[in-house]
Amino acid sequence: MSPQIRVNKMGWRISTHSERSTNTDLMEGPTPRHSLLSGRYKQSFAYLTLRSRMPGIMQQVIMRVVNDLPMLEEKFGEEVRKDVKQIVDAIERLKMELNRDRQFLQFHGNEPDKAEWNAFLSELPRPKRTFFRACWLHAECYLYRRIFSFFENSRFLHNFDCFDHLKQEDLIISEETMKILAKATRDLPKTFDNFHKLLRINLWCNHFEIQLGAFTFTEEEPQNDINVLAKVADIDRVLLVNDSVLVWNCLMKPGPNGIVDYICDNGGFEFFADMVLLEYMVDNNLATQVRLHVKAIPWYISDLTRPDVEWTINYLVHHEDECLSALGKKWARLISSEKIVIAPVSHFWTGPQPYFVMVESDIELYRVLTNSRLAIFKGDLNYRKLMGDYIWDSAEEFITCLRGFRPTNICAMRTVKCEVVCGLPEGMADTLLRNDHTWMISGSYGVIQYTDSLKCSCAFPGEENNIKSEHWPALVQPRSGRSTGAQTPIG
Ligand SMILES: O=P(O)(O)OC[C@H]1O[C@](O)(CO)[C@@H](O)[C@@H]1O
């Protein structure tokens, strides 16, 4: 087969040549309903990712370090060549393991989360320990974890983020959009309507081309008023579930605790849009504090890490545009006054596990979340982990698919980029499929889903229920069903 070139979401050119698979266990057809996503199914996005996208991404990592070699030599001296060679060799080996569908290997280096990973890998049933036979979530997370381990175990490059330039470029090329959004969102009054618009802007920024097209304006159009926000109405025709009212009502309820946990997704422009929303929330007392949960290591190309947060704020503070620079300074103040904080980094977010096991596998993190008013999970990967990477009936209720994971009230905001979805009206998924067979991977459709927690019945394993319901009067509610969309915003 002749090589084909496609451009991935970060603009990388990826060769999609296929080599012969030695895997005899693959199945024709798409992933069946009520199964885990997996590279076993040849008509799935998981298969395409493992067969074509991941080798391409690994090739790009190789090119990045090789191209950076002169700069690295200048910084670290000639000895860094040895690191680069070892990293390149290790990535080539990993490509080969993936191509031959080899068993996952244990971690033996300096990885701080190696014990958790090794325990997880050895508990997987043997037939589910190879790239194409495993659940896609396990295989994909394992690949990103292995890639960073090569850097982590090197002498000079243990902090090297091989994706940082992509996140930075994404922000830099979004300058015009950032200016418009910044101007349009200064001093917005506290209304549901404004919150709703900001939520939708934020959602659509998870669809990666947004910064290039969605908010472009002609010269004659006003660039600094609320009409800019009204533009989002044009692009949310394809919002399949919209629980924004429930999210607003959750934040508006009186109660002692107004912390919001924000489980971040991508850096670059998406993080800028996240901050616009979060700034609005703290400025208007919709949250007393926001805790950003970022990734401990470079992850899924564009995911946000602590250095990305620092770089972004610093970039804005020193921007020549006055409005962006003022915004950067304001956000720096929100961070130094701890209105917005970076939560202690947890390796659970860069583990392979779905969120319903968090209570058993990372009780500390689970406890942190129980201590907040609302946890917002942003993006497709977080959604997959909430759903357990499982093909539910598309009309199944969000609350059911969480499989008991309800440390606090939960909101998921994501554009649909893989075959996992729930909470849709009966028949909608079939209609969408008839009209557009790529609807589940295009990122063109979105969901904002919400469910409240049942604090009063929540106990940690081996403990009495230690969360007293009287501490949560406003949050103790009957189980919520699927949202009807007919709710009225408080206030
Ligand atoms: O940035 P997001 O929204 O989490 O998207 C990442 C997702 O995109 C993909 O690359 C394609 O679905 C998946 O690997 C992953 O779930």
PLM segments and residue spans:
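Structural motif
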Residues: 259-261, 373-374
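Conserved structured core elements
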Residues: 48, 137, 241, 271-275, ...
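Non-catalytic accessory regions outside enzyme or core folds
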Residues: 2-259, 444, 449-491
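Gly/Ser/Thr-rich loops at beta-strand to alpha-helix junctions
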Residues: 134-138, 263-272, 297-299, 380-385
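Short, flexible loop/turn elements at secondary-structure junctions
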Residues: 147, 264-268, 296, 414-417
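Residues at the starts of beta-strands that form the adenosine-phosphate
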Residues: 259, 287-291, 409
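Histidine-anchored nucleotide/phosphate-binding helix
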Residues: 269-291
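C-terminal functional extensions of proteins
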Residues: 3-38, 294-296, 303-491
